[in-house]
């Protein structure tokens, strides 16, 4: 069976995912993308990914699955229309879901259209554990994001920090996951994913650190409850095309697509 998969956005993550799908002969796919600029199409995908004109064009193409990888604004603009039309979605920009009103609208649209919403793990691990403790009022979750200067170069000047002279680690934020995800839409989707899987946007605590000595994009997750403790530390290689995101993210999205299409899954 050939699956029809449409991307919203065709940046670093979506391009890597598209290339992975096209290379998988065991799971043939037809691909399309809704993108603001046709020049975004990498040469390796030219002629292999159809370019769509706006949400009407995407709906007319009739995909089996829509993969959003364009940022939080794209969710506000396109997700509700896709879900109402009955199109299953994978949402990569999970930070948008920190907005309770938007998340409620999307869930209502999915119910009306008979569609499903999936959020990939992305750069992190341990979501199954967080889901297991989600209902406990006595659970504590702390997440630390520690990234090198390259991941924050565009934002640091606005915080009064010179990225070229920063010599020591600096805490940029400490607080609830909701505020972290909405304040840093390009860097903290992970915070929203953890909170949605676990104990919620308010109780999940987030520490954001820029560290000139950081080895890759580092993620530390600590969970404590009477059920036990979990500590995970990941050191992910940054994406070659976008240092704000981990290279692992595209592979996580690809794995989520394969699970969505599979008859047999684990986890």
From Swiss-Prot:
NAD(+) binds at residues 123, 189. It comes from the Bacteria. Keywords: NAD, NADP, Oxidoreductase, Pyridine nucleotide biosynthesis. InterPro entries: Asp/hSer_DH_NAD-bd, Asp_DH, Asp_DH_prok, L-Asp_DH, NAD(P)-bd_dom_sf. The active site is at 219. Pathway: Cofactor biosynthesis; NAD(+) biosynthesis; iminoaspartate from L-aspartate (dehydrogenase route): step 1/1. One of its GO terms (biological process) is NAD biosynthetic process. One of its GO terms (molecular function) is NAD binding. Its EC number is 1.4.1.21. HAMAP family: NadX. The iminoaspartate product is unstable in aqueous solution and can decompose to oxaloacetate and ammonia. Specifically catalyzes the NAD or NADP-dependent dehydrogenation of L-aspartate to iminoaspartate. This is L-aspartate dehydrogenase 2. The gene is nadX2.
């Amino acid at each position: 069976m050939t699956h029809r998969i449409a991307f919203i956005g065709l940046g670093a993550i979506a391009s890597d995912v598209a290339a992975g799908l096209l290379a998988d002969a065991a799971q043939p796919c037809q691909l399309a993308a809704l993108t603001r600029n046709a020049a975004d199409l990498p040469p390796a995908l030219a002629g292999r990914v159809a370019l769509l004109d706006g949400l009407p064009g995407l709906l007319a193409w009739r995909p089996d699955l829509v993969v959003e990888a364009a940022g939080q604004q794209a969710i506000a603009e396109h997700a509700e229309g896709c879900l109402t039309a009955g199109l299953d979605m994978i949402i990569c920009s999970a930070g948008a879901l920190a907005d309770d009103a938007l998340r409620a609208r999307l869930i209502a649209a999915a119910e009306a259209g008979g569609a499903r919403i999936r959020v990939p793990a992305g750069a992190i691990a341990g979501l199954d554990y967080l889901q297991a403790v989600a209902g406990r009022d006595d659970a504590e979750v702390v997440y630390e994001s520690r990234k090198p200067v390259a991941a924050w170069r565009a934002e640091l000047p606005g915080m009064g920090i010179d990225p070229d002279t920063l010599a020591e680690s600096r805490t940029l934020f400490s607080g609830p996951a909701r505020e972290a995800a909405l304040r840093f839409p390009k860097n903290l989707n992970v915070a929203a994913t953890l909170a949605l899987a676990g104990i919620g946007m308010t109780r999940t605590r987030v520490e954001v650190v820029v560290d000139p000595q950081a080895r890759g994009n580092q993620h530390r997750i600590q969970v404590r409850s009477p059920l036990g403790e979990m500590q995970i530390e990941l050191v992910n290689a940054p994406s070659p095309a976008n240092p704000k995101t981990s290279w692992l993210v595209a592979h996580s999205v690809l794995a989520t697509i394969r699970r969505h299409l599979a008859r047999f899954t684990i986890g």
